[in-house]
A protein has these predicted regions:
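N-terminal glycine/serine-rich phosphate-binding loop of ATP-dependent small-molecule kinases
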Residues: 1-50, 78, 105, 154, ...
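Short, well-ordered alpha-helical scaffold segments within catalytic/effector domains
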Residues: 5, 9, 61, 192-196
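Generic structural signal for well-ordered alpha-helical scaffold segments
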Residues: 9-17, 97, 119, 199
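Short beta-strand scaffold segments in enzyme catalytic cores
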Residues: 36-41, 139, 196-199
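Short alpha-helix plus adjacent loop in nuclease-associated cores
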Residues: 53-70
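Short, charged, surface-exposed secondary-structure boundary motifs
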Residues: 62-66, 140-142, 199
Length: 199
């Protein structure tokens, strides 16, 4: 996960320097990311508690197979619009909570998609938030109510307390820490990679 943060900082600097952009002219920045990849970290220290578990990871396949044909599968389909598949974040979260010793006590842990992990580390105040295009690919987000689905969370034994707050994509996500570009810059938009490709 820390490699992702290094890459973000380097990319921002490269974009500014290669294009001779005056940092004082930057009014706002946005963020885009691959959506289903997750990271667990300690809320207080920001230390990662797991490697990034990629959208390509299939470790949740046995769990997914175990709930096919159950009420839980039907709830996930109806509430999220997604099928039960290890591609989506919920299976990775379930697998990690059951298999990674660092997560067993569930104290001070949080989890999020990559946008959430990046924000927690580059924004003043270290917020634990995500936005709808990322949340909607977890298999935990009710797309009708635009909230985490409590019934699904209960069925999967995922505490809502470890999940980020969900906000709109065009939200004031906070201010980029001054130590990254030498200037505090607001982050006012986040979109998943496929949605952002439209722009």
């Amino acid at each position: 996960p820390k490699e992702v943060l290094i890459s973000v900082g380097e990319t921002l600097l490269e974009a500014v320097n290669k294009n001779n952009i005056n940092k004082e002219c930057i009014l706002s920045i946005g963020l885009t990311n691959q959506r289903e990849t997750i990271v667990f970290w300690n809320k207080k220290t920001l230390e990662p508690l797991s490697p990034a578990i990629s959208w390509q990871c299939l470790r949740g396949i046995d769990f997914c197979n175990s709930i096919v044909g159950t009420k839980l599968e039907a709830m996930i389909n109806k509430s999220t619009g997604l099928k039960v598949d290890p591609y989506f974040s919920f299976s990775k979260i379930v697998w990690a909570l059951r298999n990674l010793k660092a997560l067993f006590d569930k104290k001070d842990i949080c989890v999020g998609t990559i946008d959430s992990w990046i924000l927690a580390n580059i924004v003043d105040g270290n917020p634990h938030i995500t936005e709808i295009t990322n949340a909607s690919r977890t298999g935990l987000f009710n797309t009708k109510t635009e909230t985490w689905d409590i019934e699904i969370l209960d069925g999967l034994e995922i505490p809502i307390s470890i999940l980020p707050k969900v906000v709109k994509s065009n939200h004031n996500f906070g201010v980029l820490s001054v130590n990254i570009l030498g200037k505090k810059i607001p982050i006012n938009s986040i979109l998943g990679d496929q949605q952002s490709s439209l722009y």
